[in-house]
Amino acid sequence: MLSTMSNLPIVAGISTTATTGTTSTATASTSTSGSVNTTATNNNNNTSASNSTSASSATANGGIGTNSGNSLQYYYTGNNTSNSVDGNKYSLPSIYFTPQDSINNTSHTYNPYTTVSGAVTPQNYQLDYSQSSTVNNNYQFTLPNQQLSSPQQQQYNRSYSNSLMPNYHYNNTTTNINTNVGSNTSPQLSNSNTPNPISPVLIPDKDNTYNNTNNVLVSSYPSMTMNQIQQQQQQYLQPSQQYQYSYNQYYMQPYYHNPQQSAPQQVQKPAQTEKLPHLSVTNIDYSSLVSYTVSPSLKRKRRTAKKSLSPSSTSSLSMMINHDSTNNGTTSTATTTRSSSTSSATSSSIGVAAADSFPCPQCNKVFQKPYNLKSHMKTHSNEKPYHCNICFKRFARSHDKKRHELLHQGVKNFKCQGYLNDGVTSWGCGKTFARSDALSRHFRTETGWLCIRPLMEEAKRLEEEEQQRQQQAQQQQQVPQQSQVSEQIGVNVGEIKFNDEYYDNSNFIKKLLQSNK
């Protein structure tokens, strides 16, 4: 028999079946006593015969049962032993043989070359990879009788299922394999303790002495040569190397950014320093700026505060002023004028507030005209017939809808910028706003106050010049009353209160500037 069969262990209790025909299957097993039970079944006559043979063939040939004229089919798992015949080494993969014998402690390695161990030459080694549903996808190869080293000249077929091919997947579990040949008492080979290789690098090489004992791998891939395994390793390694290179190239390399330094843009000023024709030296209309600076809400708050002043408090204030002047022993025109102006301003403001105020019954807003109150009341109703043509918003008033649509168009007609009387000096930050109330809120902020500060300083200077001009005119007309006129002017300039008539005057800007000093 083959020298490779010398390491097979002797297992008791396994029946042997031989089937005559084109493809016959037999399982040989020996008992410890040395007797071999062989059962042959003929496919044509459906007869069975039981023979009892001596232990000569079992002991001499490594426990292999024989049946003359019939070919035997074996299933092997485990390690492999290799022999040299004529200087050539032929061996089957280690996964097709049973574990090595305890007597033979030689370590075996995985041989990628699919060859047959024994006195078989490569020319006579024939593989049949035919697959069909009838043979259950089994691979078979035939060993002729002339190539057997045993005196028992017989031909047997060695077949293995498609599921016994080497596993090149990288799962960490092994699959149980049934080695049933025709008997229910056939053992099941399984091993889940030995880990499978988890990466292509761990696939054993030809000269590696790693012991693959009792490791049964299942796969549908055919056996591979060493060159194919190396190519597969390179295919697995190349993507990881490329990924690592791209990763290092993207994350590890420094990033150099050299932005082109552009020269700062210089604000182009008007080349002509001549005064603009539409601007006047003496008369400057600041009504638009004042209307932006002081919103109607501030007016309403001040008007509400003045309502709290009662006539008794006003009279007491005037009495206090007169009492102070009497105790000092001097009665001046300025003090009398101051008290009278205060009382008149207070009474006029109270009367105007009582007559021209139209408060909203649902909120704290107060309006000067009934039409404004009527328009405002629409905002408290649930009716919103005007809807935006661009978005889903709806409005109660048409002008609110038009003002909203300007936001979609990007129209910003209100700008914080202007020129002083000389036509060269500019004021403002240049920001644009879509609504006038947004610009007025900007003026009330600290930044907006700095924007209009040059304009206020110019207004203060022009008012002082106007006051000096008036004083000179009065001095020319009435020289004896010069002091009285100057005091009267001082009272009119410095003691004017914040009432409704004062909002449309440019003196308001001057008053705000003096209050911040």
Swiss-Prot record:
Keywords: Cell adhesion, Metal-binding, Nucleus, Repeat, Transcription, Transcription regulation, Zinc, Zinc-finger. This is Transcriptional regulator CRZ2. Residues 19-61, 174-185, 308-318, 325-346, 469-485 have a biased composition (Low complexity). The gene is CRZ2. One of its GO terms (molecular function) is zinc ion binding. Gene3D superfamilies: Classic Zinc Finger (3.30.160.60). Disruption phenotype: Decreases cell adherence to silicone substrate. Blocks biofilm formation. Induction: Expression is down-regulated during growth at pH 8 by the pH-responsive transcription factor RIM101. Induced during exposure to the weak acid stress of acetic acid, through the regulation by the transcription factor MNL1. PANTHER family: IP01015P-RELATED (PTHR24377). The keyword Transcription regulation applies. One of its GO terms (cellular component) is nucleus. A zinc finger (C2H2-type) spans 358-380, 386-408, 414-446. Transmembrane segments: none annotated. Transcription factor that regulates pH-induced filamentation with RIM101. Required for yeast cell adherence to silicone substrate and biofilm formation. Residues 19-64, 174-209, 296-346, 462-485 are annotated as: Disordered. It comes from the Eukaryota.
